[in-house]
């Protein structure tokens, strides 16, 4: 059994034209003397006398397509080196042989299967099927490159100017707020209620205005007739204290909480 061969030419006929051998040598890039020729390959029982992956290129000139069975395609793949080329020439007299051969090559694991007219001038071998063995060996492994996902980069424009927050403040914003004086409403008997009064002075003044009385008349009530402090039953029609509760002279009149409420 031959160990290796630059190129191998096989045929199921008794002889192989020299032109076909030359075509294989030219396609394989070797000299004609480096091509090993095997005739009547059908008698080999589908076996080729070569080691595994020991042949660079194979040319098969097959007259009968039935001689190119699946077993023979597998044998060609066995002796071919990884990435090796195979050329198959068949007779055009067979019914659409190229499609059948292409299908067998594809099922046999070959790639880049193409059909073209043969360069040989032999009219009996005018259809050429070209294919290529895969460049990797069965059982070989290689690492897969995992895509690394990086964090998105934030583009920071150093030329951009930052706004000073203090520049957004006005002069009024910078002024110190004036706090209200605690208990200011209670200072002095003649003080008026402030705008946002919460101590009750505003309500008291509203009651006084309704009665048309002065603060002095409320805080220190006096009666010329002596009946004003006894109640409405003893007051005259022009009494300024009419409608107020009874009181003692000189004591502050206590107005009820519902004094301003409307009578139903």
UniProtKB/Swiss-Prot annotation:
Residues 143-174 are annotated as: Linker. Residues 1-142 are annotated as: N-terminal SAM-like domain. A motif (Cx2C motif 2) lies at residues 236-239. The keyword Transferase does not apply. Its cofactor is [2Fe-2S] cluster; [4Fe-4S] cluster. GO terms for biological process: iron-sulfur cluster assembly. Its main location: cytoplasm. [4Fe-4S] cluster binds at residues 225, 228, 236, 239. Keywords: 2Fe-2S, 4Fe-4S, Cytoplasm, Iron, Iron-sulfur, Metal-binding, Mitochondrion. HAMAP family: Anamorsin (MF_03115). The C-terminal domain binds 2 Fe-S clusters but is otherwise mostly in an intrinsically disordered conformation. The N-terminal domain has structural similarity with S-adenosyl-L-methionine-dependent methyltransferases, but does not bind S-adenosyl-L-methionine. It is required for correct assembly of the 2 Fe-S clusters. Component of the cytosolic iron-sulfur (Fe-S) protein assembly (CIA) machinery. Required for the maturation of extramitochondrial Fe-S proteins. Part of an electron transfer chain functioning in an early step of cytosolic Fe-S biogenesis, facilitating the de novo assembly of a [4Fe-4S] cluster on the cytosolic Fe-S scaffold complex. Electrons are transferred from NADPH via a FAD- and FMN-containing diflavin oxidoreductase. Belongs to the anamorsin family. This is Anamorsin homolog 2. It comes from Oryza sativa subsp. indica.
């Amino acid at each position: 059994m031959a160990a290796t061969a630059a190129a191998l030419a096989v045929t199921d006929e008794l002889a192989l034209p020299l032109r076909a051998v030359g075509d294989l040598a030219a396609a394989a890039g070797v000299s004609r003397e480096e091509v090993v020729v095997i005739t009547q390959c059908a008698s080999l029982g589908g076996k080729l006398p070569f080691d595994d992956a020991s042949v660079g290129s194979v040319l098969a000139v097959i007259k009968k397509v039935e001689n190119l069975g699946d077993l023979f395609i597998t044998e060609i793949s066995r002796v071919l080196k990884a990435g090796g080329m195979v050329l198959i020439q068949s007779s055009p007299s067979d019914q659409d042989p190229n499609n059948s051969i292409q299908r067998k090559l594809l099922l046999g694991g070959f790639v880049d299967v193409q059909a073209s007219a043969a360069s040989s001038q032999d009219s009996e071998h005018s259809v050429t099927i070209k294919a290529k063995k895969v460049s990797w060996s069965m059982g070989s492994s290689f690492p897969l490159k995992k895509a690394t996902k990086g964090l998105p980069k934030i583009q920071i424009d150093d030329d951009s100017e930052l706004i000073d927050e203090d520049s957004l403040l006005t002069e009024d914003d910078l002024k110190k707020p004036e706090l209200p004086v605690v208990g200011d409403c209670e200072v002095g008997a003649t003080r008026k209620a402030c705008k946002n009064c919460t101590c009750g002075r505003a309500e008291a003044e509203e009651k006084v205005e309704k009665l048309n009385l002065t603060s002095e008349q409320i805080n220190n009530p006096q009666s010329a007739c002596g009946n004003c402090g006894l109640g409405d039953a003893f007051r005259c029609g022009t009494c300024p204290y009419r409608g107020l509760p009874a009181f003692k002279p000189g004591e502050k009149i206590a107005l009820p909480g519902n004094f301003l409420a409307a009578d139903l």
